[in-house]
Amino acid sequence: GDKAEREACALLSEFTPYEVERRFGAGMENDKGDLVGIPDTVIQCANWKDTNAAVLQKPREAEQQRINAKANYAVTLVRYKKRPNCKHGDNWRVVMTIEQYARLIK
């Protein structure tokens, strides 16, 4: 959702040297991801109650979005419910398929 995407943008902008923003038109035909700003990378966000489903489904969608965007890399950010004493940003996980990870480290 919008709130989670804004949160992810703020965290990535804080923790990386890049200015990350929400992509206009996310979710439309030929989707190219939810966020922009990390070079050559498609970023998909998921803030689902069923985080296991998000971990399985969203990286597959991110891969199609990577192809649509003609980018080299795709990552999925999955937001988990904050736990007590959770550090700033620690309720997010970066998820990739094995193929996506292999492409990243080549």
Regions of interest found by a model, annotated:
Residues 1-106:
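Catalytic phosphate/metal-binding cores of nucleic-acid and nucleotide-processing enzymes, i.e., regions
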